Curated annotation (Swiss-Prot):
InterPro entries in the record: Glyco_trans_1, GS/SS, Starch_synth_cat_dom
Lineage of the species this protein comes from: Bacteria, Bacillati, Bacillota, Clostridia, Eubacteriales
Purpose: Synthesizes alpha-1,4-glucan chains using ADP-glucose.
Origin species: Clostridium novyi (strain NT)
Family, as annotated: Belongs to the glycosyltransferase 1 family. Bacterial/plant glycogen synthase subfamily.
The EC number(s) this enzyme carries: 2.4.1.21
Class of the enzyme per the UniProt entry, highest EC level: transferase
Catalysed reaction equations from the record: [(1->4)-alpha-D-glucosyl](n) + ADP-alpha-D-glucose = [(1->4)-alpha-D-glucosyl](n+1) + ADP + H(+)
CDD domains to which the protein is assigned, alphabetical: GT5_Glycogen_synthase_DULL1-like
GO terms under biological process: glycogen biosynthetic process
A Pfam family hit: Glycos_transf_1
Transmembrane segments: none
Protein keywords: Glycogen biosynthesis, Glycosyltransferase, Transferase
This protein's name: Glycogen synthase
Amino acid sequence: MNILFATSEAFPFIKTGGLGDVSYALPKALKRKGTDIRVILPKYSSIPQEYADNMRKVAEFTVGVGWRSQYCGLLELEKDGVKFYFIDNEYYFKRNSAYAQMDDGERFSFFSRAILESINHISDFTPDVLHCNDWHTAMTIPMLRDQYFNNPKLNNIKTVYTIHNLKYQGRFGKEILWELLGFGDEYFSEDKFKYYDSISFMKAGIVYADAITTVSPTYAEEIKTEYYGEGLNGLLQSRSKDLYGILNGIDTDVNNPSTDMFLFDKYDVNNLEAKARNKEKLQEMLHLPKNRDIPMIGIVARLEEQKGFELIKEVIEELLQENIQLVVLGTGDQRYEDMFKFFAWKYPDKLSANIYFDGGLAQKIYAASDMFLMPSRFEPCGIGQLIALRYGSVPIVRETGGLNDTVFSYNEFTGEGNGFSFTSFNARDMLYTIKRAIGFYYDKDVWSKLVQRGMNGDYSWEKAAEKYMRVYSNILHKW
């Protein structure tokens, strides 16, 4: 089975969020299942030089963007047994950031068509399935169906479209249809691309894909409701039989406390004394009082409303009256950055606010913290709670999306559970749940079982890869 995996980012070349992790780890897992899977993404100028220097040129050709023809280079590089292709065009991809550019509609219109044109220039590979991810590659699917149906190399390709976050849809003015995408006015309709008075790239992918997946079973159900559906819930309900919720994994080779080079001390489930040493050394590094017995709560996240920081804002003063240390890492909304900076100044022995991002420090926080807080308003899957579990940091989460599928609240009567959770998006409920977790932290027998249960869980991509294989097989065997 030949799979072309189209994405706007992939670790270790470019990563701004969870999509980058998925686009590296899932293809590796699918490769182990025997597929010939190849990944295609833009050649951003920010790709580390060590990779750029080793890319081999496959082809050069032009790609139509409306009435213009734009240069396109196709390069390749193998990483961990998977072949990666890179779409090269400095005008579109030599930027100071991968996204949030004024011409993103044009950039990813070019990229969508360049993906299809590239297939014509890869002599040893024709995909059976084109697997597109999020809005940046969504328009590739209707282009394939309605503009390339006479191309003998492309006309039998089936399509899978994965929604990583429905909130970000790629919405642009309707003039983009004919100016950049080569579609006529008839595509500005409710059954095609129209989203109120604009067009939605993501909607186009959902309408035209043979199968649709999203990144957890709960999120697959949530997005069919008005609250989570971002205006597409009716469409998603109509495509329910083609919609699959497949839980993301994490790369357990990269996220492994027994081999993680970023940790002060490596450890495993049989050596939790070394985890405690990580805590003490992080306390020293961040100028917090050195005390292995005080519960440390970690937060590693984008500081934005989706992640539930409005709840923290409501009760942070009360939370910091508890005998805890709170370690925060991330950037985002100025309100939340300023909030954490202020309370770190007010309570320097209780709060360390690290308003930047550092992958090494993130790993240290997972290893050192006793609890990991994710009170998200919505969370399609979430990776933080999975890394936390693997590193023995007990998650405290709101029951939404993938958090609901992976964290099971501790039941003191049965002893079951691997974390703590609350249902309503409510600050008092969150605070109660944190206090409940702190209470059980001091019961060492209960806490050690929670930590061990989390560390012994299977968070690899193997189960997800099996489910994606079934989705691919289903659409390939449909008449």
